[in-house]
Amino acid sequence: MQEHIADMFGIEERLKEKGISVDSMVTSAMLLYVPHGLSAEEATHKIREKIIRYLRDPNVASLLLGAILLEDELYLRQKDSGIQEDPVFLISDEIIGMAIAECIGGTYARFEFTRYDQKKPGILATLGPFLDDAVAGLIAGCTSRLYSECC
């Protein structure tokens, strides 16, 4: 039942429509990977598995859907909304990213989210204010969980 709910959101397909593939997220994750007893090849494989798994989690999927819809509305449709440059007063995007990270990796993932949010490796540098933080949260949650499982 849980997978069916997440699948009805079509998150992986919606992200692909925005130019965000699983491969691009894995590549971005590996740009800030901190070796933890796994080879880069092993870590890449495990991060890919985690990203795919958590794209199907209904809580993560619904937060990602929220970020997609907010970005479509405020960044693309309402071009005079003032959020194109990710203004300081806009914090809901970070809240979504942190929530995704914590859903997956717990409190430690919040710190991992900060690394990805600040450095914006790979695909993150090309995304708007909501999707960069939502995808950073997904990556951070998955890498944080990987680090806690392998150490």
Where are the regions that the model predicts?
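A generic structural micro-environment signature
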Residues: S21, V26-S28, A61, L70-E71, ...
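Long, charge-patterned amphipathic interaction tracts in eukaryotic proteins
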Residues: T44-Y116
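Short, hydrophobic/amphipathic alpha-helical patches that form generic packing surfaces
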Residues: T27-L31, L65, I96-G106, G137-S144
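N-terminal interaction modules that seed assembly of large macromolecular complexes
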Residues: H4-I68
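Glycine-rich, aromatic-bearing surface loops/beta-hairpins
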Residues: I104, Y108-C151
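Intrinsic-disorder-associated interaction segments
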Residues: H4, K18, A40, T44, ...
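A near-ubiquitous, low-amplitude feature marking generic local secondary-structure context
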Residues: M8-E12, G82-I83, P87, P121, ...
